[in-house]
């Protein structure tokens, strides 16, 4: 499990909640850090903030999907942007789920549990 968010408070909130649910969690501060860590960590699921410096979530998710070594990793985009065109963009990239901030930690945990070990399919 890899949690990617430039906001330390949100990153730690997600990581702590997932750790309490039994997930082994690694964190990254932005998209570039995510791409550096993903090959060595081989996570099953990545929670990925959209708005980040250096490399945003859109570009990071696209690069994950284009790389055969990371294309099968489940990706949950998390964003304050709740417009349908943002969700559509996520579907076009091939992310597995899209959560909007503020999100219910229980919902995030449910989504991550469903995706852990599930085949890669764009969210509904």
Where are the regions a protein language model picked out?
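Charged docking surfaces used in two-component/phosphorelay signaling
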Residues: 12-20
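Short hydrophobic/Thr-rich beta-strand motif most characteristic of the beta2 strand and flanking loop
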Residues: 22-29, 37
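Active-site beta3 strand of CheY-like receiver
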Residues: 41-47
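Receiver (REC) domain active-site loop signature in two-component systems and cognate sites
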Residues: 52, 75
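Short, glycine/charged-rich "phosphate-handling" switch motifs in NTP-dependent
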Residues: 96
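C-terminal output helix
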Residues: 103-113
């Amino acid at each position: 499990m890899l949690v990617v968010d430039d906001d330390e408070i949100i990153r730690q909130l997600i990581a702590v909640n997932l750790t309490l649910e039994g997930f082994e969690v690694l964190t990254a501060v932005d998209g570039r850090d995510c791409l550096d860590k993903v090959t060595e960590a081989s996570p099953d699921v990545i929670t990925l903030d959209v708005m980040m410096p250096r490399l945003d979530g859109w570009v990071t998710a696209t690069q994950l999907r284009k790389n055969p070594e990371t294309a099968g990793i489940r990706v949950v985009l998390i964003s304050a942007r709740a417009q349908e065109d943002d969700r559509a963009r996520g579907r076009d990239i091939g992310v597995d789920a899209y959560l909007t901030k503020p999100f219910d930690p229980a919902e995030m945990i449910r989504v991550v549990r469903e995706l852990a070990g599930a085949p890669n399919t764009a969210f509904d």
